[in-house]
């Protein structure tokens, strides 16, 4: 009996050693396989999850049937198709603006797309694709006394939390009383109810609201060409960022970007940097 046990032990040890070796080899082989199966570092390699907004017209907003549309949405769908993803493989989810970049950083979304301006501060926590649009920051108001920055002194000025407008206003409109909102719709509702005197937002969005509410006028326009909007990706996900850049520049070069800009921003000048090159 003791002899038999002595015989079994070496074979048991040998089997264990072989099993351990097989598992080690399998684990090592699994790493490159996983990378090959998910070259863009996506949360789910079969889809691209995109955080966006439902009220940032004409960039990103929801239609009456609950679908997302807008310049950013259509541009991203075109870019995604160029890197191999069909429309039904791109999953859009609406959020408040302030939550978009943290959600990408924390791997809730692969990308955020909502006319998000590129700044050095934001690049500390997330990465950006190359820029795809730039324009103006605007003050929307029904108050005829507001015609310049000085006219905002002592006024209640709405801003959407986390936006370039909030950053700019805190630095440059120090005499105004800033009131922070989760989105433009709630801020404009407050403006229409005279809870705030003015709202600071993107020019194209301001133009849309002023067309819907004729009493609201665009009183101030401030250039923001130094912070063009880009698609937000997780910090260090260079594979996805570079793929987006390649597809984005292809969309610019073949005129897709121009067509979408003309559709969503009729009459607005187009920066030459985004137009086809000879």
Predicted segments, located by residue:
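A ligand-binding cleft/hinge motif common to bilobed small-molecule-binding domains
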Residues: 99, 114-124, 168-171, 192-225
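Ligand-binding clefts/hinges and TM-proximal coupling segments of bilobed small-molecule sensing domains
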Residues: 37-38, 167-181, 217-220, 248-278
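Bilobed "Venus flytrap"/periplasmic-binding protein-like clamshell domains
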Residues: 50, 54-57, 66-83, 117, ...
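Periplasmic-binding protein-like
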Residues: 54, 133-140, 203, 207-248, ...
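Extended ligand-binding regions for polar small-molecule ligands
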Residues: 73-83, 155-156, 161-164, 230-268
């Amino acid at each position: 009996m003791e002899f038999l046990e002595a015989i079994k032990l070496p074979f048991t040890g040998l089997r264990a050693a072989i099993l351990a070796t097989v598992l080690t080899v399998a684990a090592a082989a699994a790493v490159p396989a996983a990378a090959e199966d998910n070259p863009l570092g996506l949360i789910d390699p079969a889809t691209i999850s995109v955080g966006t907004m439902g009220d940032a017209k004409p960039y990103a907003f929801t239609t009456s049937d609950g679908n997302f549309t807008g310049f950013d949405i259509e541009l991203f769908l075109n870019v995604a198709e160029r890197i191999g993803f069909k429309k039904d493989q791109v999953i859009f989810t609406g959020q408040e603006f302030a939550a978009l970049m943290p959600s990408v950083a924390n791997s809730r979304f692969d990308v955020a797309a909502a006319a998000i301006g590129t700044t050095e501060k934001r690049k500390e926590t997330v990465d950006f694709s190359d820029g795809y649009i730039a324009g103006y920051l605007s003050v929307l108001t029904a108050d005829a006394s507001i015609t310049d920055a000085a006219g905002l002194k002592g006024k209640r000025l709405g801003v959407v939390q986390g936006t370039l407008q909030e950053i700019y206003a805190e630095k440059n409109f120090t005499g105004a009383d800033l009131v922070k909102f989760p989105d433009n719709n709630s801020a404009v509702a407050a403006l229409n109810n005279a809870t705030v005197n003015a709202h600071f937002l993107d020019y194209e969005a301001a133009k849309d609201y002023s067309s819907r509410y004729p009493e609201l006028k665009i009183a101030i326009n401030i250039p923001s060409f130094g912070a063009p909007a880009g698609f937000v990706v997780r910090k260090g996900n260079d594979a996805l960022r570079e793929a987006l850049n390649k597809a984005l520049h292809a969309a610019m070069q073949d005129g897709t970007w121009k067509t979408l800009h003309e559709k969503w921003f009729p009459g607005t000048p187009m920066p030459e940097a985004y137009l086809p090159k000879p």
